[in-house]
Amino acid sequence: MNSKSRITAIGTHVPNQILSNNDLEKMIDTNDEWIVQRTGMKERRIASEDEYSSNLAIKAVENLCTTYKKNLEDVDCIIVATTTADYVFPSVACQIQQYFNIPHTMAFDLNATCAGFTYGLHVGNSLITSGSHKKVLVVATETLSKVTDYTDRTTCILFGDGAGAILLERDENKPSFIAYHMGTNGHGGIHLYRTNLSTTMNDTPLQTNEKIVQNGREVYKWATRTVPVGIKELLHTANMKMDDIDWFIPHSANLRMIESICEKSQIPIHKTLTSVEYMGNTSSVSIPLALDLARKKGKLNNGDTLLLYGFGGGLTHLGLIVEWDLS
């Protein structure tokens, strides 16, 4: 893979409010043991009523700046991965541009659901490698609690809120990106959706309360079948073996799903980083949260080779192999 960009900084933010399994017991017919057994989740963070995806995104970028120690005025592209933008338009990316007063930049949102962060990294790397841009800010931000049906016990136990940001800069000598693999199965879109204008999909009537609707069984089957094949293809493209990978960071959809993917891909679970236990499923945000949690715990070292894999609604997926080096 011809890459000329490097990951140079990371920042994250989660809301203060915690929604525990015990809290959910008071809202729906469920219990802590049932949730942990099926998902591995104990807590998730929930945005306040007047806190939106743009607010979380801005705080994640501010957190990035505490370690980056430089200003962002020369950022020439802002990419925001989100399914829960404050508005249909303007984009969250434009709100970030306004807040940080970045003078000359392209700014747009992309919607690839839980694969949004890896999509954003891939697009950002491609823009820099092409020579059209030099510094790209990639942000993932979600307030899924605002579109979660808290009467549906199969979905409301899953989702949480948060934001993560990564900075990409042109560096031909120490590029981060090694390989990518991606794919889409639009036929499976009916299994995970949230309505907007249309009330049907491929002539099938939809639930139209604008909340997340998921056929968990079908999504599980697709992910545990598709992602292991994608990992194999990704390693083949990079001319690597799993032994060459220091850390596997999948989308933190559900711990049981991750365990199945690891088993089928022969990935030791101790080489896997997630944010699922105390953050829940934060869609596009789960991978940067897992990365930053590991960084803060001292697990990530400069020179580590990481395999990131996002997958979700669409149905769509994208995996990346990158070298981690913030030096």
UniProtKB/Swiss-Prot annotation:
Kindly list the biological process annotations in GO that this record carries.
fatty acid biosynthetic process; secondary metabolite biosynthetic process
Transmembrane segment boundaries? none
Annotated active site residues, numbered on this chain, are C114, H251, N281
If you read the UniProt record, what top EC class would you report for this enzyme, in one word?
A: transferase
- Pathway involvement of the protein, from the record: Lipid metabolism; fatty acid biosynthesis
Q: Show the GO MF annotations.
A: 3-oxoacyl-[acyl-carrier-protein] synthase activity; beta-ketoacyl-acyl-carrier-protein synthase III activity
Q: Which reaction does it catalyse?
A: malonyl-[ACP] + acetyl-CoA + H(+) = 3-oxobutanoyl-[ACP] + CO2 + CoA
Query: Where in or outside the cell?
Result: Cytoplasm
Known Pfam families for this protein?
A: ACP_syn_III (PF08545), ACP_syn_III_C (PF08541)
GO CC annotation: what is one?
cytoplasm
Segments for region (ACP-binding): 252-256
Note the superkingdom of the native organism: Bacteria
Q: Which CDD domains does the entry mention?
A: KAS_III
Matching InterPro entries: ACP_syn_III_C, ACP_syn_III_N, FabH, Thiolase-like
What interactions and quaternary structure are annotated? Homodimer.
> According to its UniProt record, which protein family does this protein belong to?
Belongs to the thiolase-like superfamily. FabH family.
The entry's free-text remark on domains says: The last Arg residue of the ACP-binding site is essential for the weak association between ACP/AcpP and FabH.
Q: What does this protein do?
A: Catalyzes the condensation reaction of fatty acid synthesis by the addition to an acyl acceptor of two carbons from malonyl-ACP. Catalyzes the first condensation reaction which initiates fatty acid synthesis and may therefore play a role in governing the total rate of fatty acid production. Possesses both acetoacetyl-ACP synthase and acetyl transacylase activities. Its substrate specificity determines the biosynthesis of branched-chain and/or straight-chain of fatty acids.
Mind telling me what this protein is named? Beta-ketoacyl-[acyl-carrier-protein] synthase III 2
- Protein's organism: Bacillus anthracis
